[in-house]
């Protein structure tokens, strides 16, 4: 490594005020011994009135480790901070006088360097240096008591290779050697900054010299940066970066931090209930028990959701899914429950053919018909032991975005009075009202739905056994469209 001694020649030449400095150093030997880790700086220039000021480099051992290998500092177009950070301890200031602390970076020599065979060597003459910029500490101006109270940090200073940088960063050339300097200027109201009579002093630390690079050349410097800089994530593995991010966030946050990879997996696995993923909507025991005996068959909230293929292929069709009778509600406990007639098709097959009336209502053979109200009341008390809470009805998990279909004219409306009184308890969307009313028509030449009792007419058919016409609350009523379906063709 070729160091130029011309730049630091003033460091070894005594100035006019050095005898007084030597006396002060003799008096403060104990003080220097106490802070031996940060010895006094090499003083380049001291004006009259600034003689007693001492500056000590913070983390001198770390700077020495880098200096022995050959310190490198990354420069980018946007600007990059230095590491190790430039921090100093200042003593000897007048507590009541205001000072301005600033820093600049000057060329250490007139050479251009290259890194080959694991060492730096001179490769040519240096490029013309850009006009030097000064970085003024953000706390300036401040009293001497303020500067001496704590460490003075220049960690916000950034280095750039953009010669047109508009942000005030220090402009450097790559593969050139530079030396940082710190200046202490007395802020006098009578004398403006930069005038001939302004008192200031400059301090230089040779171990802070570095070579500006766009990428680290020496792998030893890279290793030192990783070991000592908690923010040097660019050369670590992805797992180390993730763990480092989590540890930093966990130390400042009270809630647990989840890795990004886990979040992506969870988001990818959980789908909306309308995309066909039944796992996206997990039903609790209380909710599933309240849907367990609707319409004479047991079902869960998952059974009421459409499969993915049918939803995407038939977005404009209402379709039914076969539901199984659960083992939790055997037919012996609930005599009104009758299973569906088994068909030869698979359980996952979606069908659009019209069912017979006995099948759609869960009746088999000549079993007596029981009204909907009695079935709902029995289901209420036969469900889970905990008191039922208001849960969304089947209309709430239907397809509200599907427009209503045109319904052909029907001859009679045997369910008209029952539905009108029942739907008066709550306001329903237009689509559901149209769909429910269309199902109430039973006799149609093209419907293909047969009535179980031709002799019973209207309300006589509904209440053939003389049961009381009790209307259950709206949260327990059932949409009759779950099991009854018109014969829709593909054209509709």
UniProtKB/Swiss-Prot annotation:
DNA-binding region: 62-237
GO molecular function, one term: sequence-specific DNA binding
Region annotated Disordered, chain positions: 1-43, 331-352
Basic and acidic residues: compositionally biased ranges: 17-30
Any one Gene Ontology BP term: DNA-templated transcription
Protein name: T-box transcription factor TBX5-A
Subunit organization: Monomer. Homodimer (via the T-box); binds DNA as homodimer.
Gene: tbx5a
SUPFAM superfamilies the UniProt entry points to: p53-like transcription factors (SSF49417)
Keyword field contains Iron: no
Keyword Zinc: no
PANTHER family: T-BOX PROTEIN-RELATED, T-BOX TRANSCRIPTION FACTOR TBX5
UniProt function note: Required for pectoral fin formation. Together with tbx5b, involved in eye and heart development. Required for the looping stage of heart development. May bind to the core DNA motif of promoters.
InterPro entries named among the record's database cross-references: p53-like_TF_DNA-bd_sf, T-box_DNA-bd, T-box_sf, TF_T-box, TF_T-box_CS
Species of provenance: Danio rerio (Zebrafish)
Compartments (UniProt record): Nucleus; Cytoplasm
């Amino acid at each position: 490594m070729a160091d130029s001694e011309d730049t630091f020649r003033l460091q070894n030449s005594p100035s006019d005020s050095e005898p007084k400095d030597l006396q002060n150093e003799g008096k403060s030997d104990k003080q220097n011994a106490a802070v031996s880790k940060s010895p006094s700086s090499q003083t380049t220039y001291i004006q009259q009135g600034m003689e007693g000021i001492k500056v000590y480099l913070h983390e001198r051992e770390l700077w020495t480790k880098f200096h022995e290998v050959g310190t490198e500092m990354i420069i980018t177009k946007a600007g990059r901070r230095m590491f190790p950070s430039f921090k100093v301890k200042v003593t000897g200031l007048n507590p009541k006088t205001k000072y301005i602390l600033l820093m600049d970076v000057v060329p250490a020599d007139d050479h251009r360097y290259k890194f080959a065979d694991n060492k730096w060597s001179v490769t040519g003459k240096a490029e013309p240096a850009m006009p030097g910029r000064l970085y003024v500490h953000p706390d300036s101006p401040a009293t001497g008591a303020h500067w001496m109270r704590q460490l003075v940090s220049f960690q916000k200073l950034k280095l750039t290779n953009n010669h047109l940088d508009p942000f005030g960063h220090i402009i450097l050339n790559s593969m050139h050697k530079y030396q940082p300097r710190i200046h202490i200027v007395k802020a006098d109201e009578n004398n403006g900054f930069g005038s001939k009579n302004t008192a200031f002093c400059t301090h230089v630390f040779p171990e802070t010299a570095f070579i500006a690079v766009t990428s680290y050349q020496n792998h030893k410097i890279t290793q030192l940066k990783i070991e000592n800089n908690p923010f040097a994530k660019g050369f670590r593995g992805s797992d180390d970066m993730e763990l480092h991010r989590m540890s930093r966030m966990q130390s400042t946050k009270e809630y647990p931090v989840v890795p990004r990879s886990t979040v992506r997996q969870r988001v990818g696995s959980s789908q909306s209930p309308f995309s066909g993923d039944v796992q996206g909507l997990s039903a609790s025991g209380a909710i599933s028990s309240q849907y367990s005996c609707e319409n004479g068959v047991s079902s869960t909230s998952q059974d009421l959701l459409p499969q993915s293929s049918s939803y995407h292929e038939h977005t404009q069709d209402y379709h039914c899914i076969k539901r199984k009778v659960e083992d939790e509600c055997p037919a012996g406990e609930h005599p009104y429950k009758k299973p569906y007639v088994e068909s030869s098709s698979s359980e996952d097959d979606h069908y659009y053919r019209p069912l017979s009336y006995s099948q759609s209502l869960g009746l088999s053979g000549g079993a007596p018909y029981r009204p909907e109200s009695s079935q709902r009341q029995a289901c209420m008390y036969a469900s889970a032991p905990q008191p039922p809470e208001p849960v969304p009805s089947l209309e709430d998990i239907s397809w509200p975005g599907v427009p209503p279909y045109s319904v052909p004219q029907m001859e009679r409306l045997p369910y008209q009075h029952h539905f009108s009184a029942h739907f008066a308890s709550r306001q329903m969307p237009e689509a559901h009202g149209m769909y429910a009313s269309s199902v109430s028509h039973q006799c149609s030449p093209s419907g293909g739905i047969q009535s179980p009792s031709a002799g019973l007419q209207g309300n006589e058919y509904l209440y053939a056994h003389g049961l009381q016409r009790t209307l259950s609350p709206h949260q327990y009523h059932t949409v009759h469209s779950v099991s009854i379906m018109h014969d829709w063709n593909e054209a509709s």
